[in-house]
């Protein structure tokens, strides 16, 4: 859902009070003036989307850090809108997909990622 609003300092400040991590605020600024802004509400994710994120890491299309950041927007939300417990568990796993056990290796190996796919597709 995209909700474009024209510039209005009071309205913008009021809107900022109600933002949480499950929304994204995009602001168009020119010469230090806010011209317009948009608030995008994140939609609820599903298990297939989570599994596809793992596959994109395994295929080298996405970094672990990008997937972790994506999952973190749901996990760290003030009021997460995830109803499915399996999706929630997967999001928690994915929020830590970028953890490292040394400076060069990740805590979760590619075998672990493949195991996650198997575990959640059975």
UniProtKB/Swiss-Prot annotation:
It comes from the Bacteria. This is Uncharacterized protein YxzC. The lineage of its organism: Bacteria, Bacillati, Bacillota, Bacilli, Bacillales.
